[in-house]
Amino acid sequence: MKNNFLQRAITGILFVAIIVGCILYDPLAFGTLFVTVSALTIREFGHLVNQSGEVSINRTITMLGGAYLFLAIMGFCIDAAGSKIFIPYLILIIYLMVSELYLKKKNPVLNWAYSMLSQMYIALPFAMLNVLAFQNDPEASSVSYNPILPLSI
């Protein structure tokens, strides 16, 4: 009992230290950390959903979609790309929907629903951290990284 508590406490402290360190270090570390966390969280969600037996979502495509959504919103927020950066994400979502129809799976509509849920429930909140982290100053035409706002969440 005591050993398990100690192991969990040390793991928790390390996890918090990595998150805080990456957020405070620089924008690249922030992006790398949260794109990884987003993709792995979607992978775990897909694993849990697929265990039910009724649903079979494509974990690889949903992971790629979640990671790309984070990177696209990050690129848009730092003014590295325009709104056209979201076109590959839309193509990926359309591919996901069309592929479910032709793969002859048990419940294609339920698979769509859980795939979209993973994008909206997991990937989108992580991606919205970029909106908090990067402030655009139109007068100086620059973007600044503010680690305090994502850290406050």
Describe the predicted segments one by one:
Residues 1-153:
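Membrane-embedded alpha-helical bundles of polytopic integral membrane proteins
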